[in-house]
Amino acid sequence: MKERRRRRRKLLPAGGLLALGLGTFWFYQRQAMPWMRRWGASDEELQAVLPGDELIPGPELTTTRAVTIQAPAEKIWPWLVQMGADRGGMYSYTWLEALLNCPQVNADRIHPEWQDLQVGDRVRLCMGEMPPPYTVVAIEPGCALVLAHPALTEEDRQFGPWFDTWAFVLQPADSGATRLIVRSRTARAVSWLRWIEAGVFVMERGMLLGIRDRAEGRIRAS
């Protein structure tokens, strides 16, 4: 009898940890992940067809995130076209980028020398080649900037010429404000994407807020 009680006491903590783990996994899959994938976006924005969608017509993974910026599109657009680790930065958390061995400096003003972005140019997330730079595939000045990674492996090319797209779309809102909508579409949801999805959300949310603060003049040029 005493031996059974000892075993039961040992099993109770293990069972509690298992239940906690399963509960955390359920919450992440059913609550946190759907919220992260549509942070800030309205139902209409989720359903809207945006520039770049046609490049991957049947994605396995899509995120649509958005923020309202109290500024017209022409005040926001220059911040978008100068993005890049080797240019104006990604406007996110530099301390976290440094921890990820991706140090960069976020611009606090518009740089005229970085405004002539063209289709075919590359936009780097980090200095160097990892992660691979995005290629600019479409530009609608003042409206939309679409970046993409080409499908490099034979397996990926079975899903089409593009592995993923990243679109930045500006749409007018009430009272002179603008909605910045960022949509990512991935042709093939490879397993490693699931492991980094939460981190990508943190960085992209930081980027959206960073662009908003700069366009609204909350961050003063040094």
Give, region by region, the residue ranges found by the protein language model.
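Bulky hydrophobic/aromatic packing residues
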Residues: M1, R7-K10, W77-W79, W166, ...
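Short amphipathic, positively biased membrane-proximal segments
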Residues: M1-P57, T62, E74-K75, Q158, ...
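Glycine-rich portal/gate segments that line the openings of hydrophobic small-molecule binding cavities
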Residues: A48, I56-E60, T68-E74, V81-A167, ...
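Short, charged, low-complexity patches
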Residues: W192-L208
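Helix N-terminus capping/helix-initiation residues
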Residues: A41-D43, G120, V200
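Short alpha-helical segments used as structural interaction elements across diverse proteins
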Residues: R4-R7, N106, V202, L209
